[in-house]
Amino acid sequence: MTASAAPPGWPGDLTGSAAPAVAGPAGLAEFNGLPADAASRALLACCSSERWAGVLLAGRPFPSAAAALRCSDGAVAGLEPADLREALAGHPRIGERAGAAGSWSRQEQAGVAGTDPATLRALAAGNEAYEQRFGHIYLACATGRTAAGLLALLQDRLGNEAGTEWGVVRSELQKINRIRLGKLLGGAGGDGGASGDGGAGGGGA
């Protein structure tokens, strides 16, 4: 497929091999009109699950941002365990510095910035304990939450059974993806209730 330039309002080059930075308010029409390869890269920057991105691609063109968000919710609900792990792989631990592809997480974990060293150490220890118990990173909707709040939530979730915790992870991923997709479509995601986000752990947004 021939590469095309990123439409106005989209940061970065969606035609190259690298994932785009956090997208600005491009709008639904621009998203619907992107070539499939460019749209796929934009979606995978929101969530690294290939299955989730594929469902969203197949759903285009969306008549409204709300329809796209409903599609995202349904896609997350249909993810298999391997798909969920693939999605988790795209999130840094909460409290850790995000890498080059972690623009979303840096935004979402703003409440962790400037946290006192003792709380950061407790988060690091909590992340390790969580991963030892469940075998994957701690994913939580970090948007609007403080480091202390995320730590308290982590400690509470350590008491969950594995099956229960996977259900919580799926719910948190839905929130994160709604916030990110909403921003991609021009701010339609809303807050944690309508959209949500987390640092995956920080994993999360």
Give the positions of each predicted feature.
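Short glycine-enriched loops at secondary-structure junctions
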Residues: T143-R145
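Long, amphipathic alpha-helical surface segments
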Residues: A147-D191, G196-A205
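Conserved catalytic/binding loops enriched for acidic/polar residues
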Residues: Y138
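Aromatic-anchored, charged helix-turn/loop surface patch used as a conserved interaction hotspot
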Residues: M1-Y130, K175-G190, G202-A205
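Residues forming anionic-ligand binding surfaces in small-molecule and nucleic-acid pockets
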Residues: R133
